[in-house]
Swiss-Prot record:
Function, as annotated: Binds to DNA and alters its conformation. May be involved in regulation of gene expression, nucleoid organization and DNA protection.
Protein's name in the database: Nucleoid-associated protein AHA_2212
Superkingdom in the source lineage: Bacteria
Any Pfam family the entry gives: YbaB_DNA_bd
Cited NCBIfam families: DNA_YbaB_EbfC
Any GO MF annotation of the entry: DNA binding
PANTHER family reported for this sequence: NUCLEOID-ASSOCIATED PROTEIN YBAB
One Gene Ontology term, aspect cellular component: bacterial nucleoid
Organism: Aeromonas hydrophila subsp. hydrophila (strain ATCC 7966 / DSM 30187 / BCRC 13018 / CCUG 14551 / JCM 1027 / KCTC 2358 / NCIMB 9240 / NCTC 8049)
Amino acid sequence: MFGKGGMGNLMKQAQQMQERMQKMQEQLAQMEVVGEAGAGMVKVTMAGSHSVRRIEIDPSLMEDDKEMLEDLVAAAVNDAVRRVEEQNKSKMGELTGGMQLPPGFKMPF
């Protein structure tokens, strides 16, 4: 079915892919993206692991409506999450060489 050395070769390739995925996960965790809201008045810096590293709020917003500020922070966090997901998808696409994965199959993140 696998031919001469086919199964061993397949296992070796799987192990190499696993090692590359581990390295990619480490690189993605170190990556940072910045999500913005309110034309850059609220910025959220997020790691590739989805942890928020920093929130910057323009001082002029401190005088405004608290509810609006909360909405802008939430929007900036959501923008950062979207950017992390795009970056992760792009990097994993590079790793898998554009290999089409079955629907619902998620990489280990």
